Amino acid sequence: MAGDYNRAFQQTVETCALVICLWVCKEEIWDTYTKEEKDVIAEFLRGYADGNTVPQNWRLFNMLDMAFLDMEGYEIDEEIMLDHAQSILAYYAGDGWYRDGHSFDYYSCWAFNVYAPIWNLWYGYEKQPYIAAKFEEHSNKLMETYADFFDRDGFTNMWGRSNIYRNAATSAFDGNLMLHNSTADPGLARRISSGSLLQFMTRDDFLFKGVPTLGSYPSCRGRKGKEDQRSRRT
């Protein structure tokens, strides 16, 4: 692929995870680095923050890389940031949902409605208040009906791509609760999140030799698998 200037790199995704972890563990990790060490990391991040991306949820990875750099005092290309943010807004389809490419699935929830609230905290509320307000409005709109995607036990209705992410669909509640004007019901959000976690962790086939298995349900038994699981709990 050498010489392909349109190529996007998977590392763009992973650098987003990296900056979130550095934010969460800021005092324990980031703040212990010297200025020179931080500069090395910042230069590494910049290569992906300003680099090529995929025109869908990936734009949020670039946005968070740049927002982290800005938050830590490094210069960023604000025009690129604005272009990404406006593009994300253009993917909005209504009722709290974003198109990811031409698809609707849980990526709208665990990507758009999680990374956008984090971006608001790091950058948007201060630097792009109009866009931040729209992200907040969209997340709050999703909260009006999103609980209906889970059953009475909080189990996730597996749908769309990457069911391997299992209970990640509940992260949209976490994203909303980060907002300045959150409308999520904290108690209901906790109940659903706990139930969805138990949906997988209480299964006999969740672990193999102590390590979580790949897939949603390894046996892919669907409804029967859920009934079997409930019978084991009684």
Question: What label would you give each PLM region?
Answer:
Residues L177-T234:
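Extended polysaccharide-engagement surfaces of secreted carbohydrate-active enzymes
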